[in-house]
């Protein structure tokens, strides 16, 4: 199993990994543009997502962050990667790394996914 998570899915993945007994089935996780649910303006809009799980992930992970993501600063994304024991990629100015980012089929993301699957 290789997990792929975007935005709040990254937060959910960290929470799930901290509470499940099935993490050994996971080969890796590609975490893209996490949402900072502890940021006051976002926490007020999305109740019940904080606090963010702080345990290292029990499987290899790659976290991809953007310099101009409106939902998570690059510094915060890098700090989450460090907390979770994930490799961090500064993906430049790509917004929330979604369809609006103009990445199309996102060959680079597919390549990272293949690397995680092969690990």
Predicted features, each with a name:
Residues 2, 27-30:
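Residue in the alpha/beta-hydrolase core beta-strand immediately N-terminal to the catalytic nucleophile
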Residues 29-39:
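Active-site nucleophile loop of the alpha/beta-hydrolase fold
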Residues 21-25, 51-58, 82-84:
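Short, conserved loop/helix-junction motifs that constitute active-site signature segments
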Residues 57, 62-65, 69:
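Short beta-strand/loop motif that positions the catalytic acidic residue
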Residues 4-14:
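Gly/Ala-rich beta-loop-alpha elbow adjacent to hydrolase catalytic centers
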Residues 70-76:
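Conserved alpha/beta-hydrolase "acid-adjacent" motif
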Residues 47-60, 107, 111-119:
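Conserved serine/cysteine hydrolase catalytic core
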Residues 94-105:
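Catalytic histidine-centered segment of alpha/beta-hydrolase-like enzymes
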């Amino acid at each position: 199993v290789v997990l792929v998570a975007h935005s709040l899915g990254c937060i959910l993945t960290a929470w799930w990994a901290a509470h499940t007994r099935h993490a050994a089935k996971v080969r890796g996780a590609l975490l893209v543009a996490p949402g900072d649910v502890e940021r006051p303006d976002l926490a007020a809009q999305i109740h019940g997502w904080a606090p963010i799980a702080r345990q290292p992930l029990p499987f290899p992970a790659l976290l991809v962050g953007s310099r101009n993501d409106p939902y998570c600063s690059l510094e915060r994304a890098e700090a989450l990667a460090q907390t979770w024991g994930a490799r961090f990629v500064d993906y430049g100015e790509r917004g929330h790394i979604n369809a609006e980012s103009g990445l199309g089929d996102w060959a680079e993301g597919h390549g990272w996914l293949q690397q995680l699957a092969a690990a």
